[in-house]
Amino acid sequence: MNGFSQQLEDFYPSYFSPSPLGFSEPEVQPVAMNLVPTIQKDIQQQPNRKEVTKIPRASEQSPVQNVRPKEAINTKEADSRNPEPDSSLVSASQRRKRTFFTQAQLDILEQFFQTNMYPDIHHREELARHIYIPESRIQVWFQNRRAKVRRQGAKATKPALASHHYSSTSGAMFPSAPAPNSSSYQMTSSRAQVQPPKEYQLNKFHQSQGFLSYPDSSSDVSRQRFLLSQATPGVYHLPQASSNVYDQNVKSNDPLWGQQQVYTNMESVLNLSRRPQQMPAQPMFMNSFQTNKIIKSKMDTTSPPIPVSTTSSHHSQMSLFAGQDPCHMSTAPGGTYGQISPISDSGVSDTSPEPSSDWEENVSVLLHL
């Protein structure tokens, strides 16, 4: 027993102390022996302290630790490249696919659309079985076809309505605007042809006055008076069918009334020797003016005073020609009167036979008409 305890003390000296209180004395060990176990403990505890206190960097990680993140990254990239198919995405992609119809399918759908524009579910299913197209696609086709019909109808009705509105407004605003080929346009053109303008009528009137013939053999005074009457026809000529009231008004208002009567009567007398049938029907007012008064025309020409003859009372109307020297006038062949007019012919001949009483009587009768 003592031997066994001795062995235990040898193996566990710290638990067996010689003191009576049971406290063992501190064991004194050599310095070299004590340093070795402390160094070993420090070596063993140093990696644990690094792992706890110090966070390793990516460059300081072990190859095993570096492999694991790469594998995780590769798996994430693979997941992003090949995502798992979502049901909503798949259904949306299927709806966006365009349906292509063949010509035979379009003909069948168009033929059915002509008979029925609003097919029900049963008709659509029957068409789907017949042309091998889903019923939903057939429904969409009919919707689009009805919209196309509405667009075409709107385009066809808009121009017609616009033209009707324009015609109604234009008719209300301009009711008398005729078409260029209408009957009113033809009537106005015919009226314009029938009624020439006033300027044309005036020109024609002057031309007709220019064609009037004056006596071939006449005096310079008569020729000058004739030219004056042609230059101003409105002053020296009065209308033949004028009434007495009109003549009186002209007498009172027009200061040249005497000149007008003189030239008018002179013309009628001059034409008497050639064409008695052209004598005017209006009576000549020979006594309405003074014979001894000097007459001034617009061309500042004066005529000598005409002396009044008192030889006979019935020859008072021919007093204009009593003081003038009669001269010979050549008569045209085939003239009405063979006798010679008492009007002078610019002094060509100094002597002329006396006028006969028959000629004077004819002149007086015509003057008294």
UniProtKB/Swiss-Prot annotation:
Disulphide bridges, residue numbers: none
Upregulating conditions: By activin and TGF-beta1 (immediate early response gene).
Biased composition annotated in UniProt, kind: Polar residues: 179-193, 338-355
Phosphoprotein in keyword set: no
Region spans: Disordered: 39-94, 153-194, 324-362
A Pfam entry, by short name: Homeodomain
Subcellular location per the Swiss-Prot or TrEMBL entry: Nucleus
Gene3D superfamilies in alphabetical order: Homeodomain-like (1.10.10.60)
Broad class of where this protein is predominantly found: nucleus
GO terms of biological process kind: regulation of transcription by RNA polymerase II
Record-linked InterPro entries: HD, Homeobox_CS, Homeobox_regulator, Homeodomain-like_sf
Gene Ontology, cellular component aspect: nucleus
Biased composition, class Basic and acidic residues, residue ranges: 68-84
DNA-binding region: 94-153
Molecular function in Gene Ontology: DNA-binding transcription factor activity, RNA polymerase II-specific; RNA polymerase II transcription regulatory region sequence-specific DNA binding
Keyword annotations of the record: Developmental protein, DNA-binding, Homeobox, Nucleus
Transmembrane parts of this sequence: none
Membership in a protein family: Belongs to the paired homeobox family.
General function of this protein: May be a transcription factor which play a regulatory role in the development of the embryo.
Protein name: Homeobox protein Mix.2
Provenance organism: Xenopus laevis
